[in-house]
Amino acid sequence: MTKQHANWSPYDNNGGTCVAIAGSDYCVIAADTRMSTGYSILSRDYSKIHKLADRAVLSSSGFQADVKALQKVLKSRHLIYQHQHNKQMSCPAMAQLLSNTLYFKRFFPYYAFNVLGGLDEEGKGCVFTYDAVGSYERVGYGAQGSGSTLIMPFLDNQLKSPSPLLLPKQDSNTPLSEAEAVDLVKTVFASATERDIYTGDKLEIMILKADGIKTELMDLRKD
């Protein structure tokens, strides 16, 4: 076996950062559009946000080939669900499906780090954050990807989500208005782009509300 073969890995990390914030009647999901490997930029216009249902949007960083495979599985299972139940999945139902799908592949996992955002059955914003093998939690805000270690302390400082151990159970939604949440997302990405070479080029923001989805774009550093 040559040294080249010995060092071969089925995985790559294509970088990028994803953030989601849940509000009282909205959910903001954002990700940069840079896809890279090592010190090479493969694309400056690659969307990491994927609409799974009218009220559920997935944003993923990691190995983008695995991300695409995961999206295909979720899309096909959601189609089966629609044929059987004559309705679309809610965001919490999609969150459980994503957890089951990731856990099923735990011995050869999808190298994908996911944030799922959307609206629950009551119309409130919800965010679910995952590890690679399906362990997940409903939170008020979350970040995944190469810039998440820079962004999460910033969000913790600004939002301070209540502990899930508090009784009675606290509402996990953030107190921000929709405009404030969008401004905060723009600020954290502008900051992370200064320090993380795998995050940059453009910021794609999706805002989910009961009346539909809006999309915004913002330029980031291109170096």
Curated annotation (Swiss-Prot):
Which InterPro entries does this entry report, sorted A to Z? Ntn_hydrolases_N, Proteasome_bsu_CS, Proteasome_sua/b, Proteasome_suB-type
Q: Which family does this protein fall into?
A: Belongs to the peptidase T1B family.
Question: Which GO BP terms sit in this record?
Answer: defense response to fungus; proteolysis involved in protein catabolic process
Quaternary state and interactors: Component of the 20S core complex of the 26S proteasome. The 26S proteasome is composed of a core protease (CP), known as the 20S proteasome, capped at one or both ends by the 19S regulatory particle (RP/PA700). The 20S proteasome core is composed of 28 subunits that are arranged in four stacked rings, resulting in a barrel-shaped structure. The two end rings are each formed by seven alpha subunits, and the two central rings are each formed by seven beta subunits. The catalytic chamber with the active sites is on the inside of the barrel.
Q: Which domain of life is it from?
A: Eukaryota
Q: What is its main location?
A: cytoplasm
Q: Does the keyword Nucleus apply?
A: yes
Q: Where in the cell is it found?
A: Cytoplasm; Nucleus
Q: Which organism is it from?
A: Arabidopsis thaliana
Keyword set for this entry? Answer: Cytoplasm, Nucleus, Proteasome
Query: Repeat as a keyword?
Result: no
Which tissues is this protein detected in according to the database?
Answer: Present in all tissues examined. Slightly lower levels in roots.
Record function comment: Non-catalytic component of the proteasome, a multicatalytic proteinase complex which is characterized by its ability to cleave peptides with Arg, Phe, Tyr, Leu, and Glu adjacent to the leaving group at neutral or slightly basic pH. The proteasome has an ATP-dependent proteolytic activity.
What the record says about the induction of its expression is: During cell proliferation.
List the record's Gene Ontology CC terms alphabetically: cytosol; nucleus; plasma membrane; proteasome complex; proteasome core complex, beta-subunit complex
The record's gene field reads PBF1
Q: Which PROSITE patterns match?
A: PROTEASOME_BETA_1, PROTEASOME_BETA_2
Name under which the protein is recorded: Proteasome subunit beta type-1
A Pfam family that the UniProt record links to this protein = Proteasome
